[in-house]
């Protein structure tokens, strides 16, 4: 099941902001998301609900 882990990018490395339950050396897939800050206010009510449903169905939330 996908998990959302907040991280900060420093010196070319993503550093999680909380403890992560992974084995040392385990591979993960990182999805970088800055969408909220860049698109705030562009979408209106109905469109936003459809987008949220699509994101949730893809496992990002």
From Swiss-Prot:
<dbReference type="InterPro" id="IPR008203">
    <property type="entry name" value="AF2212-like"/>
</dbReference>
<dbReference type="InterPro" id="IPR024069">
    <property type="entry name" value="AF2212-like_dom_sf"/>
</dbReference>
<comment type="similarity">
    <text>Belongs to the UPF0165 family.</text>
</comment>
<protein>
    <recommendedName>
        <fullName>Putative antitoxin VapB13</fullName>
    </recommendedName>
</protein>
<comment type="function">
    <text>Possibly the antitoxin component of a type II toxin-antitoxin (TA) system. Its cognate toxin is VapC13 (Potential).</text>
</comment>
<dbReference type="Pfam" id="PF01954">
    <property type="entry name" value="AF2212-like"/>
</dbReference>
<keyword id="KW-1277">Toxin-antitoxin system</keyword>
């Amino acid at each position: 099941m996908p998990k959302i882990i907040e991280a900060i990018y420093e010196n070319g490395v993503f550093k999680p902001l909380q403890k992560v339950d992974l084995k040392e050396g385990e591979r993960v897939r990182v999805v970088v998301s800055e969408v909220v800050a860049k698109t705030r206010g562009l979408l209106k009510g109905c469109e936003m609900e459809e987008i949220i449903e699509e994101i949730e169905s893809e496992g990002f939330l």
